[in-house]
Design a protein with these regions (language model features):
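Short linear segments in intrinsically disordered or otherwise low-structure-confidence regions
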Residues: 6-7, 32, 43-45
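Basic, polyanion-binding surface patches
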Residues: 52-252
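Intrinsic-disorder-associated, low-complexity terminal segments enriched in Asp/Asn/His/Tyr and depleted
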Residues: 4-5, 13-15, 42
Length: 252
């Protein structure tokens, strides 16, 4: 079971080091850090457990809590890749972010997925909804074995990358590796998105994504307990709150 923990969200713990990793990606953040009340200390005595303590000013209602990890909401996806032994394979992940045509995912260095992606340099990010939760969990718990046939997942190889595109996942990103940075047992995989695929009912007549129709599951929790969270039907267009505030100010 420990292997499942390392796959499903396990790499989110390392994102505190991404400021350093971005330097390898030729991006540097030059703006000074904002000042905060109190003092932030990182304590890591033996590397086995990291603790953070925030010494707040008097009257601050927040309190520090000790935990080995904190996942504040990451979309779950099924990572598809070619496998030298099994032909095609999948595993479950939750550590990713995307900017423009770039995608960064985190995978444990000792995992089969990391070895295979290093070899083939290509993969797919298959994003399920709540209808595929059983298969999603099974893909995470089973380790170093063939999983696509075992789980009964229908797929087709991508024409661009030959990585598996899962039929049951409404949204898929087809990706090619640009570079891999390994740190503290984690492979941070920087990739270019070659293609974005979505089921037809998620696109309008002009080919625009219907944001209110897609509801991926999110991974959330701490060292004590991890859970899945789901989206509801509420949406607000980007910038709508500023527009409302301006209208309110204009009336006053």
């Amino acid at each position: 079971m420990s292997g499942y923990h390392s796959k499903l969200g396990g790499t989110a713990d390392t994102y505190s080091s991404l400021s350093c990793l971005w330097q390898g990606f030729s991006i540097a953040f030059k703006e000074p850090r904002p000042k905060v009340a109190g003092e932030f200390k990182d304590i890591d005595a033996d590397g086995a457990k990291a603790r953070s303590t925030f010494l707040s000013k008097e009257g601050d209602m927040k309190q520090s809590f000790e935990t080995s990890k904190l996942y504040y909401g990451f979309p779950i996806f099924i990572l598809g890749y070619q496998d030298q032994t099994h032909g095609y394979n999948v595993t479950t992940c939750s550590s990713s972010y995307s900017l423009g045509d770039w995608l960064v995912i985190g995978v444990g260095s000792e995992e089969n997925a990391a070895d295979q992606i290093k070899h083939y340099q290509k993969f797919t990010v298959n994003i399920p909804d709540e209808n595929l939760m059983l298969e999603m969990e099974q893909a995470g718990f089973i380790s170093h074995r063939e999983k696509i046939d075992k789980l009964g997942l229908d797929f087709r190889p991508s024409k661009l990358t030959q990585a598996p595109i899962l039929d049951a996942c409404p949204v898929v990103l087809d990706c090619k590796v640009d570079r891999i940075i390994e740190e503290d047992g984690i492979c941070h995989i920087f990739a270019k998105i070659l293609d974005r695929l979505a089921e037809s009912d998620l696109l309008d007549d002009r080919g625009h994504f219907k944001n209110d129709r897609f509801a991926p599951a999110y991974f959330m929790g701490d060292g004590h307990k991890r859970v899945y969270r789901y989206l509801d039907d509420r949406i607000d267009p980007m910038g709508s709150f500023i527009k409302k505030a301006r209208k309110k100010n204009d009336k006053s």
